[in-house]
Structures are given as structure tokens and as C-alpha cells.
């Protein structure tokens, strides 16, 4: 027997059609409109994140992304409170690519790189070398270079990113980025651990020593020869009254421009100095005697003609270049560098033939008819002579006593 039909038909699983209709999700048009709004919001946020690269902007957009996720979750919960065909909020949206690859903008983006120039690892300070090529890892943003084996020992460090071009010219990793490149030192040792380069150490020590010496010499102005000679000149007027005072005055004035040879002064006893000065003052004419080394032809009426070997008595030496002297009864001016002073017990010699000496043996070269003086005795056939600025040994057989 067929049961009677009822105006109320059961739906699926014995539920009424009204209940099934009430549980249906909203229309696809409303869902698509909500998705389009979310996509537009995501595009605007991603565009702003790419345009602004500062740290504050990154933090701002990360906070905005988290608020966006909460807003999306709230909107989806309002759309489907019980069940929804849309995926969960976690799978619906993902963090931006920048935040996914570099969480917080601090991670390095290492890539395989072949180093053409000698490069050192920023972790172990050793050179990146290989059998065939110099393979290693290099950060795409901050250009940090490391070995493959040093990736495990790499401490979590903040990537500074790409620097502006204006700042990149004066970029110095050891001085500006202490957190990332703290292991690099100003003088990087070449595969020698923490040892300092000996060449650098030597140069640094030499520079400091030179600066210290310069400061010390500039500070001790009272030790200069000019100051000492000036104090000596103060006593000159009192000593010029006695005999030989004029010579002593000239002697002291000339000592202003006299410097010790080889850094040594003539240290004598005071008694010896007094005796020496007394002997000089007794015979001032002897100390004012010079011998002509070269021939001088007068250029003016007041000039004094000289021939090699002439004995000249000095009358005035106020001018550095031209002196006034006397030869027998002739008086005139002559070049100061054409004469040689005669000391006591010095003899005058003339070279009879040209002699070429050996500098290694202390000999000098003299031309024919050149004048020289000497006060020493012969030793093994040689005698030490003085001719102008030259001083050395000459064979006695090439000299003639005049």
C-alpha cells in the first residue's frame, strides 16, 4: 500500500528543505566582491612596501599586514560563521615575499658566486680559494662573502642591505658596520690567524719614532748653535779692546755658520783653549794669510790679479763672496773661493802631473799645476793634502814644494 503523500517533503538526510536552504552559503557574487576588495588591498600594500625601503617603513607595513590579516579573518568569519568554502585565514593570504625570504629584513640572501679577485671570508678571515675556481657564497644585498663551510658557523647577523651610491664611495666595512663585519680588522692578516703584518708594524713604529724625534727637536730651541753663538757675540765688545780683538771678533762671527763634522765637537780642556787662543792672538798676520789656488784675471779696476801659489794677506772679509786682500804692494778684491787659508806649519805644494786617486783608499785627484797645502809628514810615500774642499792622500813624487 502506497503511503499517502504529504505536502511537507523531506530533504536530504531526512531534513526539511527549508532547513537545507537555510544552511546554504551566500551567493558567489558577494563572495567574489569580498575577494576582489582583499586583492586590491594586498596590491596597494605590496606596492608601497617595494617603494619604501627604510627600516621604519618595513616595520610599519609589517604591522599593517598583521592588522590586515586580522581584518580578513573578521570579514571571513562574518561571511561564513559556521562553515565556509573559502580556505582558512592562514592559507588565504601569505606574508609579503620580502618578509618571507628575509624575516624582519635582517637575513642574508646568499647566492653562488665565482670570485675573480682575491677575496677574504667575512667569517674566518681566510681567502676564498678552490681547485679550479674561487667558488663561494655572496649576499645579494650587502655583498657579504663567505665560504660554503662557514654557513653553519654564521651567527645571526643583520643584513644592512644595498647602500646608496653616494655613500658607497666612502664605504668602510670595518668602521661603519660593527655588527655585521666585526671580525674584519683594519689590517687583515693573510692566512696567519690574528698576527699583525710585520711590515705594517715596522712602518707604524718608524712613523711614531719620527714624530717623537721631531717634537723633541722642536721643543729644545735653547740647544741650537745659533743661540749659543749669539750669546758668545754679546761678550765680543769687551774683548775687542786688547790686541788681537779684531781677529777674535771675526773668529766668533764665522763660528755662527760652522757646524760640527760627523756630529762631534772639539772638546778641549779650558787651559788648552786659553793657550791656543793666546798663540793665535800673538800672530794674527799668520792666520790672515791665504794662498791662491786658481788664476784670477781682474774684471774691474779694484780687482786683485792672482796666480796659483800667490800669498795673499786678508784685509777685509765682510762680504761672503768677495774679499779684500794684499799681494806685496797691490791691494784689491778677489773671489773668496779662489783661496785657501794657511795654518801654522803648513807647506804649499804644486802638482807636477795629473794624478787620479782611488776613493776607496782615501786618495783624491789633482790636476797638473794645481795648488794644495799640507802640515803632515810622509807615510809610505803618500802625504795627506788639502786643496779647496778636497782632502786626501797624494803620492809625494807628484808634488813640488813651493
Swiss-Prot record:
Any GO BP: positive regulation of protein localization to plasma membrane
Name of encoding gene: STAC
UniProt subunit comment: Interacts (via SH3 domains) with CACNA1S. Interacts with CACNA1H. Interacts with CACNA1C.
SMART domains membership: C1, SH3
Keywords, ordered alphabetically: Cell membrane, Cytoplasm, Membrane, Metal-binding, Repeat, SH3 domain, Zinc, Zinc-finger
Leader peptide range in chain numbering: none
Origin superkingdom: Eukaryota
Cellular compartments annotated: Cytoplasm, Cytosol; Cell membrane; Cell membrane, Sarcolemma
UniProt keyword Cell membrane present: yes
One Pfam family cited in the UniProt record for this chain: STAC2_u1
Biological function: Promotes expression of the ion channel CACNA1H at the cell membrane, and thereby contributes to the regulation of channel activity. Plays a minor and redundant role in promoting the expression of calcium channel CACNA1S at the cell membrane, and thereby contributes to increased channel activity. Slows down the inactivation rate of the calcium channel CACNA1C.
This protein's name: SH3 and cysteine-rich domain-containing protein
InterPro entries, sorted: C1-like_sf, PE/DAG-bd, SH3-like_dom_sf, SH3_domain, STAC1/2/3, STAC1_SH3
Region of interest: Disordered: 1-47, 211-247
Sample GO molecular function, one term: zinc ion binding
Membrane topology per record: Peripheral membrane protein
Zinc finger (Phorbol-ester/DAG-type): 107-159
Domain SH3, chain residue ranges per copy: 285-344, 347-402
GO-annotated cellular components: cytoplasmic side of plasma membrane; cytosol; T-tubule
Amino acid at each position: 500500500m502506497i503511503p499517502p503523500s504529504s505536502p511537507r517533503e523531506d530533504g536530504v538526510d531526512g531534513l526539511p528543505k527549508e532547513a537545507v536552504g537555510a544552511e546554504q552559503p551566500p551567493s558567489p557574487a558577494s563572495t567574489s566582491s569580498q575577494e576582489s576588495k582583499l586583492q586590491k588591498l594586498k596590491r596597494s600594500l605590496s606596492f608601497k612596501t617595494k617603494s619604501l625601503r627604510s627600516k621604519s617603513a618595513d616595520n610599519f607595513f609589517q604591522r599593517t599586514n598583521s592588522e590586515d590579516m586580522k581584518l580578513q579573518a573578521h570579514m571571513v568569519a562574518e561571511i561564513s560563521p559556521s562553515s565556509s568554502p573559502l580556505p582558512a585565514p592562514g592559507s588565504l593570504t601569505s606574508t609579503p615575499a620580502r618578509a618571507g625570504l628575509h624575516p624582519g629584513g635582517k637575513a642574508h640572501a646568499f647566492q653562488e658566486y665565482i670570485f675573480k679577485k682575491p677575496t677574504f671570508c667575512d667569517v674566518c678571515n681566510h681567502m676564498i680559494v678552490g681547485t679550479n675556481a674561487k667558488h663561494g657564497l655572496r649576499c645579494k644585498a650587502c655583498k657579504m662573502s663567505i665560504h660554503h663551510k662557514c654557513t653553519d658557523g654564521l651567527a645571526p647577523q643583520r643584513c644592512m642591505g644595498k647602500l646608496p651610491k653616494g655613500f658607497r664611495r666612502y664605504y668602510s666595512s670595518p668602521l661603519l658596520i660593527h655588527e655585521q663585519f666585526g671580525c674584519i680588522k683594519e689590517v687583515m692578516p693573510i692566512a696567519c690567524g690574528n698576527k699583525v703584518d710585520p711590515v705594517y708594524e715596522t712602518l707604524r713604529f718608524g712613523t711614531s719614532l719620527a714624530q717623537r724625534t721631531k717634537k723633541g727637536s722642536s721643543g729644545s730651541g735653547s740647544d741650537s748653535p745659533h743661540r749659543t753663538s749669539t750669546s758668545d757675540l754679546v761678550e765680543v765688545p769687551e774683548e775687542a779692546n786688547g790686541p788681537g780683538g779684531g781677529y777674535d771678533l771675526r773668529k766668533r762671527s764665522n763660528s755662527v755658520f760652522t757646524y760640527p763634522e760627523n756630529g762631534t765637537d772639539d772638546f778641549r780642556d779650558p787651559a788648552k783653549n786659553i793657550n791656543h787662543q793666546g798663540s793665535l792672538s800673538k800672530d794674527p798676520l799668520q792666520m790672515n794669510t791665504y794662498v791662491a789656488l786658481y788664476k784670477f784675471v781682474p774684471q774691474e779696476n779694484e780687482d786683485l790679479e792672482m796666480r796659483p801659489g800667490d800669498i795673499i794677506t786678508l784685509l777685509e772679509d765682510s762680504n761672503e763672496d768677495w774679499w779684500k786682500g794684499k799681494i806685496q804692494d797691490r791691494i784689491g778684491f778677489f773671489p773668496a773661493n779662489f783661496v785657501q787659508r794657511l795654518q801654522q806649519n803648513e807647506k804649499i805644494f804644486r802638482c807636477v802631473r795629473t794624478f787620479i786617486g782611488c776613493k776607496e783608499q782615501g786618495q783624491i785627484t789633482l790636476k797638473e799645476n794645481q795648488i794644495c797645502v799640507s802640515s803632515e809628514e810622509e807615510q809610505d810615500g803618500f802625504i795627506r793634502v788639502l786643496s779647496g774642499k778636497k782632502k786626501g792622500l797624494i803620492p809625494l813624487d807628484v808634488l813640488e814644494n813651493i
